[in-house]
């Protein structure tokens, strides 16, 4: 579960290393975001020469959360870290590579480009 002020690792090659959630999209009173949800975030740490700079405001989709999520078949999925992938305005990933596994929930939310780039879908 990601909320305002949550810090996430960036799981792509845009140049950002860490982002901070400033808004959860999807309704005026929405407080938490899980795997497959879109957030507005600011870049807190970035490498020199990357596509994004520290202080940039970006949209990102969450691909891994520490808080477990119940699946319809009764199983649970959780990861060791909170991570997100930075998006363009049309919903495609801004980077060209994805690092680490991503949740299967992204397929249901129609993030097929991220699914195809990811090395593993859990």
From Swiss-Prot:
Family matches, as SUPFAM superfamilies: Ribosomal protein L14 (SSF50193)
Keywords carried by this UniProt record: Ribonucleoprotein, Ribosomal protein, RNA-binding, rRNA-binding
GO cellular component, one term: cytosolic large ribosomal subunit
GO BP term, example: translation
Keyword Zinc (UniProt): no
InterPro entries according to UniProt: Ribosomal_uL14 (IPR000218), Ribosomal_uL14_bac-type (IPR005745), Ribosomal_uL14_CS (IPR019972), Ribosomal_uL14_sf (IPR036853)
Gene Ontology MF term list: large ribosomal subunit rRNA binding; structural constituent of ribosome
Superkingdom in the source lineage: Bacteria
Subunit structure: Part of the 50S ribosomal subunit. Forms a cluster with proteins L3 and L19. In the 70S ribosome, L14 and L19 interact and together make contacts with the 16S rRNA in bridges B5 and B8.
Family, as annotated: Belongs to the universal ribosomal protein uL14 family.
NCBIfam families in UniProt: rplN_bact
PANTHER family tied to this protein: 50S/60S RIBOSOMAL PROTEIN L14/L23, LARGE RIBOSOMAL SUBUNIT PROTEIN UL14M
Functional note: Binds to 23S rRNA. Forms part of two intersubunit bridges in the 70S ribosome.
Protein name: Large ribosomal subunit protein uL14
């Amino acid at each position: 579960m990601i909320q305002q002020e949550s810090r996430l690792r960036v799981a792509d090659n845009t140049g950002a290393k860490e982002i901070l959630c400033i808004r959860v999209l999807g309704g005026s009173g929405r407080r938490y975001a899980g795997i497959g949800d879109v957030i507005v975030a600011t870049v807190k740490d970035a490498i020199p020469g990357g596509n994004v700079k520290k202080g940039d405001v970006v949209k990102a989709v969450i691909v891994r959360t520490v808080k477990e999520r119940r699946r319809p078949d009764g199983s649970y999925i959780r990861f060791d870290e909170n991570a997100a992938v930075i998006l363009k305005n049309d919903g495609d990933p801004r980077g060209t590579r994805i690092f680490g596994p991503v949740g299967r929930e992204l397929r249901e939310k129609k993030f097929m480009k991220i699914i195809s780039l990811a090395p593993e879908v859990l």
